[in-house]
């Protein structure tokens, strides 16, 4: 069985042979972490074009090994709140073994092309595997236009523990700018569209990231309030959806503190 070190070397060689990215001539590193970074940079930058069977087999083995390196987090491992069907999970959304996780996408819906970028879109696309970008490309080709803010699309999660990924594009807020009612409503639409799609797909568990609060600059406090209020209102309007368990995933300590506070009924997100 080839090691991760060797698998990375073979994948890097195949990707560099294509000469599709600015990293095609970089020398092969001798350190594991450097190889991981180079492979990720190559696959992040690679256009949504078909891949060879040889590469896909190597990537499948490598990502299967990655998937086996941690214990997935299920709903029962998540923190309970004062709302029966709402849970909290503080950590890496890629580790959640739920029916679907929500990805904060961009309007191209093809993932992040910035090498080794720290956004959730990059992390999800990298470790779901390159088939995800190809699946998203197929959706965008059929759609024939950029993805609108507040809509939602469903794909397989491929190598992630989750079964599916729901992709939604949130609104951007310029730093220091007030959150307008229009942008607040657009963020709420992201949650409603994702919930509607989850029910349509027959899902029973859905994990939301903090949409728009990263690279898109939406203030965390307002975003948390909108997220929780929107989900609670949607649940009240869809009593048939009681079987859908909803998880709010937080990654920063600030987000965790906000959701911990707002998911106590007496605070009511005010």
Swiss-Prot record:
Manner of cofactor binding, per the entry note: Binds 1 Zn(2+) ion per subunit.
Top-rank lineage group of the source organism: Bacteria
One Pfam family matching this protein: Macro
SMART domains, sorted: A1pp
Cofactor: Zn(2+)
Keyword hit for Zinc: yes
Residue stretches making up the Macro domain: 73-267
This protein's name: Protein-ADP-ribose hydrolase
UniProt organism field: Streptococcus pyogenes serotype M5 (strain Manfredo)
């Amino acid at each position: 069985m080839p090691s991760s070190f060797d698998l990375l070397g073979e994948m890097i060689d195949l990707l560099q042979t294509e000469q599709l990215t600015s990293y095609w001539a970089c020398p092969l590193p001798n350190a594991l972490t450097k190889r991981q970074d180079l492979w990720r940079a190559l696959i992040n930058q690679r256009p949504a074009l078909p891949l060879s069977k040889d590469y896909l087999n190597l990537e499948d083995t490598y990502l299967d090994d990655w998937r086996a390196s941690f214990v997935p987090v299920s709903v029962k491992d998540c923190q309970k709140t004062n709302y029966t069907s709402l849970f909290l999970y503080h950590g890496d959304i890629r580790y959640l073994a739920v029916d679907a996780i929500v990805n904060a996408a961009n309007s191209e819906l093809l993932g992040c092309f910035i090498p080794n970028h720290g956004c959730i879109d990059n992390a999800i696309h990298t470790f779901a595997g390159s088939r995800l970008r190809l699946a998203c490309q197929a959706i965008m080709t059929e759609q024939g236009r950029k993805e609108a803010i507040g809509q939602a699309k469903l794909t397989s999660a491929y190598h992630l523990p989750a079964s599916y990924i729901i992709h939604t594009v949130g609104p951007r807020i310029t730093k220091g700018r007030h959150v307008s009612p229009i942008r607040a409503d657009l963020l709420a639409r992201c949650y409603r569209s994702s919930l509607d799609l989850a029910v349509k797909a027959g899902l029973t568990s859905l994990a939301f990231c903090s949409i728009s609060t990263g690279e898109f600059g939406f203030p965390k406090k307002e975003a948390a309030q909108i997220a929780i209020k929107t989900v609670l209102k949607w649940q009240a309007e869809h009593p048939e959806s009681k079987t859908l368990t909803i998880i709010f995933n937080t990654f920063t300590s600030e987000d965790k503190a906000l959701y911990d506070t707002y998911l106590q009924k007496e605070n009511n997100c005010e």
